Amino acid sequence: MTKNFRIEKDSMGTIEVPIEALWGAQTQRSIINFSIGEELIPIELIYSLTLIKKAASIANFNLGLIDKRKKDLIVEACTEILDGLHDSQFPLKVWQTGSGTQTNMNVNEVISNIAALKTNSELGSHQPIHPNDDVNKSQSTNDTFPAAIQISVVNEIIKNLVPTIRELTQILDKKSEEWKDLIKIGRTHFQDAVPLTFGQEISGWSEQLKDAENAIIMSLNELYFLPLGGTAVGTGINCPKGFCEESIKSISDDTNLMFYKSKNNFSIMASHDRLAQVMSQIKILAGALFKISNDIKILSSGPRSGIYELIIPQNEPGSSIMPGKVNPTQCEALSMVCAQIMGFEYAVSMANSSGTLQMNEYKPLIGFNILTSLKLLKNVIENFRIKLVDGMEPNQKKMKLNLENSLMLVTAIVPKVGYEKAAEIANLAFKESLNLKEATIKLGYLNEDEFDEAMNINSMI
């Protein structure tokens, strides 16, 4: 009978590993010991760790610490991982050691075994590439894992989230310009206020998103400084001079992003204030999107018993019992994602404040929450733009009706009659179901010509 496992050995003894798995003993122990939940370490984080391993091998070769054959084998293995050929070989859960050591070893072991396959060596033999002595040379999980989180977060924000936000603000700006002359009633406290244009209202949404985007980009500044070379506690034990600079140069070349050596490894390794700051700005973006989704839900309410100044695309039936009902489902999906991100931010803040002495032991949670938030935001913003914003249209007839019926237009005649008389006019109009002109004339405060001259809606914009 063919065995479906092989026997591997580590410092704790022997263990059975699936026969075709490219991971090794330490990864297998993590699978057994941490069967918790379904959340896996994000593949983006795996790729960033792999980038570090590739860069480290080049640095170690340039410093004369490994030979060219070992360097080439590690680089080839890393290239295959970065090409997505081995995604299934990274099965570890987020809920593991707080340093991320098991995931670091998962990457080390897979690289080692890819090299073994390329040289017809036995899986798990650690030949010709040893996961610790070669792949992990000059490194510790304590410096590589936080560096990998930082690289992943910067990469995801700059290359994915920011372009997605800009696509949304561009369409909002286009619609703002298109409807710049469409006058509607404004609302504060859910009550009628003075008029504005629909273009102005939409411009507020767009600018709010641009402000959030800029704040996120600014918060990234400190993430470009990596703690590589700090090794175990920040002192750089077992890391040769020049390794950090060599590694970071390779990472910068591979990502087309400019990373630098950290000014103080002790700070970055013991706490993740910089990551928490980025997550805080991500939460602010979520808050802006939440507000916009709520505005659209309110403005599109109806169609006959609500405000209904905004017509949204009808993508699917809204009810299993009420025929013809269409709901603002894209807004609801966006709101749920934003609520989830706000919860993630709280967890990151709590995790960041809970580190001890020379290390924060919540690294997998912090990395997972931030990267998951970024992916969710990218997906939901794109969906929101395509399925709702692109197709939304103003209900000009309802806007005109609501504008003409609003008692708050009385604000326009305050300069003529004063605040107290204007309030009296509005109250009379409401109580006796009069329009503002009728109420003003009835009270004798202005004649018809004086009212018409004062009631210039365009002058209120």
Regions found by a protein language model. Give the residues of each.
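Conserved, well-structured ligand/cofactor-binding cores
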Residues: M1-I461
